């Protein structure tokens, strides 16, 4: 093929791509096709996603008599009440569990994100020998199941004398937060042009100044994405919180709800669902505010 034929081939490919895009838009102009192709799958997805929250809300608002009755509609509340929420807040250590969960999640996320920034920058931008292998090893560390790690971690916790304290969770959560956050930030740092650093080095900037004044401001979406991921994992973590904490006043929400609100074979479903609903609200609110940054950070991390 001659050099003159190359532009014609490129133009032809572009025309074919435009025709395919136009054909796709024309296909969606029909209302029945839009219903089958878009609205119906989206409706099913939204139903499956939101129905557990609806079930938690209705169960938390039902009085005990209605919960135990076989009559009536199980998907609707006939006589709504806030008794379960009152019992949860004023008659159980739930406020302490919530405070413990917030404190542990925020501190563990901060430490993990700080360590991940330095690790990702060193691996991705300093370009030392074996940097790619180091990044791969860090990511593989994330794949190790917590059910295997908690045994040696328990021995370390006992030797340090921090069993049944918040520090036991704050120091163990980064074992699974740092590997993934590092891998995520490595992908996002890779999208930042290296020429910016070269220009800064020529102007006399240090590596610390480059990281703080150039890399981090450009990587805000990636940092928010990694922070949301780390906070969510810390908030929902169960195995370590169940193993390293035994006192009721130090427990987190995921552990406290399922261990303190169940008495033998008696399940207090109203209080259980109220606790689960209140425990899921902070994460849901956080995602609603930062979802654009989360998507942008995840998109930038998987490039290249």
Language model segments and positions:
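A structural signal for multi-pass alpha-helical bundles of membrane permease subunits
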Residues: 28-30, 34, 38-304
